[in-house]
């Protein structure tokens, strides 16, 4: 079975679509939207409940797209933690497109965030508008924007701390 899944080329994003369905065209968070996007933010370390714009206005931004069930996403958070302190003028935001509800609560998400050392804005985007706007086709996925919100780099899979630094040095 595992070989069959690997052979089918399923990525984190396609698994999400299989679990949650394709966003409907009428959904305001549907894939047709561009950037910036507004996401709900959660009360968790480094994050407060409310909303945030992705990318952040007037600041270079590292956008991490993840899922709690994605083991490689844990590794991505470690890379981000390793570089965050070196870039105080850069906004960091992690966004999941998982649907918060019966099987995953806000508390579950905050607990996962705490266990994985997240210390910056944590957002949810159940309509996958952010994922679509960045053209993400796998998780984890990292995008870096400049202060004008223009995408300057993207990376599918785990971006190492060295890769993040190299890309961030172009916008700071």
Predicted regions and their residues:
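N-terminal targeting signals for export/organelle localization
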Residues: 1-42
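Aromatic-flanked redox-active Cys/Sec active sites in thiol-based oxidoreductases
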Residues: 64-70, 97-98
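Thiol-/selenol-based redox modules, centered on thioredoxin-like
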Residues: 146-172
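A short beta-strand-turn-helix
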Residues: 35-60
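Short, internal strand/loop/helix patches
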Residues: 110-148
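Structural microenvironment flanking redox-active thiols in thiol-disulfide oxidoreductases
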Residues: 74-116, 128-132
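Short pre-active-site segment immediately N-terminal to redox-active cysteine/selenocysteine motifs
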Residues: 59, 66-69, 138
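Structural recognition of the beta-strand scaffold that forms the well-ordered cores
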Residues: 64, 91-94, 121-123
